[in-house]
């Protein structure tokens, strides 16, 4: 059986793993491809410490983002209801529909915080009334907001 070499990946490689992973590869693969192209580094105690520090920083940053998402979720629930004005025909049906972009604009106007419209799920809204939209603020944090559609 051939000897394997342990390397630390400096970028994600689909067949091996993601950045920062320690993997064992064939010596030729490491020597001829991974190391010369900067896709991996030889494992040394200094490299291990560097990877550990980087993972700690990433964890702190991820925790901070999650806390910001939780705070924004609380702010959204405190506001309660967002009003969207749309034109209505004589039969009470909207001209067009309420889109996730409309909801994002209403939230941005009320909270002064930008939100990506692609993270908002809105039911099909063709009439006036109250509806609920779902927002993905973070992979672990979701929020629901009430929308009031008026003319």
UniProtKB/Swiss-Prot annotation:
Q: Which GO terms describe its cellular component?
A: ribonucleoprotein complex; ribosome
InterPro entries linked to this entry: Ribosomal_bL9, Ribosomal_bL9/RNase_H1_N, Ribosomal_bL9_bac/chp, Ribosomal_bL9_C, Ribosomal_bL9_C_sf, Ribosomal_bL9_N, Ribosomal_bL9_N_sf
Pfam families per record: Ribosomal_L9_C (PF03948), Ribosomal_L9_N (PF01281)
Q: Which PROSITE patterns match?
A: RIBOSOMAL_L9
Q: What are the recorded GO MF terms, alphabetically?
A: rRNA binding; structural constituent of ribosome
Q: So what does this one do?
A: Binds to the 23S rRNA.
- PANTHER family, per the entry: 50S RIBOSOMAL PROTEIN L9
Protein name, entry field: Large ribosomal subunit protein bL9
Q: Which classification does the entry list for the species?
A: Bacteria, Bacillati, Cyanobacteriota, Cyanophyceae, Synechococcales
Question: What gene does this protein come from?
Answer: rplI2
